[in-house]
Amino acid sequence: MPIHDKSPRPQEFAAVDLGSNSFHMVIARVVDGAMQIIGRLKQRVHLADGLGPDNMLSEEAMTRGLNCLSLFAERLQGFSPASVCIVGTHTLRQALNATDFLKRAEKVIPYPIEIISGNEEARLIFMGVEHTQPEKGRKLVIDIGGGSTELVIGENFEPILVESRRMGCVSFAQLYFPGGVINKENFQRARMAAAQKLETLTWQFRIQGWNVAMGASGTIKAAHEVLMEMGEKDGIITPERLEKLVKEVLRHRNFASLSLPGLSEERKTVFVPGLAILCGVFDALAIRELRLSDGALREGVLYEMEGRFRHQDVRSRTASSLANQYHIDSEQARRVLDTTMQMYEQWREQQPKLAHPQLEALLRWAAMLHEVGLNINHSGLHRHSAYILQNSDLPGFNQEQQLMMATLVRYHRKAIKLDDLPRFTLFKKKQFLPLIQLLRLGVLLNNQRQATTTPPTLTLITDDSHWTLRFPHDWFSQNALVLLDLEKEQEYWEGVAGWRLKIEEESTPEIAA
């Protein structure tokens, strides 16, 4: 048997989930096409405890989070940025000063943090369960986190219903169990509040139905483990077993005195509010039994990353679906895309340090989807399109990616005010401003909506934000309208500090070789 194995080292991935209660990291490698978990790390951070009534994250909570990220960074040494995905969930969605935390995190861990929407979180949780559980058929997946609860019905890796509600074991502890006091009234109020938050989706979920219900969170895992210790060896959660558990919990007066078999010390402060939410979910959806799933958000993120390496990007499906939904003129979208990317490739050659693969992909989708707002009105098209892109549920896109796509589309025509641009943490201005310029030119050069008016050759020369666009010899004699549009565009550029657009024609016709 040879001592040295010459087979290539398996690709390793890391997914980090910045939850409201705990930060989790899971590391995996792909062996023969299968994902193999090789390490897990979890730190209780209590981020949501530091979120005040003004939705500002306290300095203490930020410090706890940054200390944990520093620990994770040690384990991630040597990982390429493409192999690490860090997602922020409910508390970072809510915190008005989340940007401050993200900027400080950049100095601690050299990987971008993506804040994802509640629905995107729910979709990824479902994918994590679907990839790791052997059960077939339609699944109901529930995840009760520190700040939000996600519910999904789906089948064969396709989510059908996706919902996220602002109720979690940390936020409910503060709202319904002040001082950690446990009594029947507090518990009932929390249980009713949870059921009430699901009122609007109850019938939708019941009508869809499911073959198996799966739970994927710390709360559900804790309930499962306590029930096992209480003699329910299969660990399945049923309404009857939940009532038995509630009865046991109500024997205690406060979180500090809570003593249940199988319940860890660190779980004490959030178990009771989490249990109340679980009871409310059971009540609202009439769940008969719930099984524990090993997979959750971070596993979903891992499989999503691995899929992108195999070019199975869910975002492409999302973009195609949106294009179909809004009846986009696919030929025009393709013309704009081709012209924009023709110029992008020239810009990238001249400015390689500013090129960003993720931004390139977002530019492509923005070019394809810049006319989604036509269904509302042609007047203000750029604003309507941006609104749709920013406010639609777009599976696969994190919040910043979605906002970036909306921003590119919002400024693809008319005047530009740089002061109105949103702030981004994942992308720098010098990286994305050229993409706005490229998309503007790509759209403008296809205003006639005919392939015949697109120049056969186009040369772009860039010097910072001073651009020269060179057209074939005598091309404008046949395309006077395009020249008028370009002259108007030059005026828009002059209104932006530092931007200049020069238009030229080749001095002599190109001679074919």
Swiss-Prot record:
Optimum pH is 8. Its main location: membrane. It is an enzyme of class 3 (hydrolase). GO terms for cellular component: plasma membrane. Activity is redox-regulated. Highly sensitive to inactivation by oxidation. Strongly stimulated by potassium salts. GO terms for biological process: polyphosphate catabolic process. It is found in: Cell membrane. Belongs to the GppA/Ppx family. This is Exopolyphosphatase.
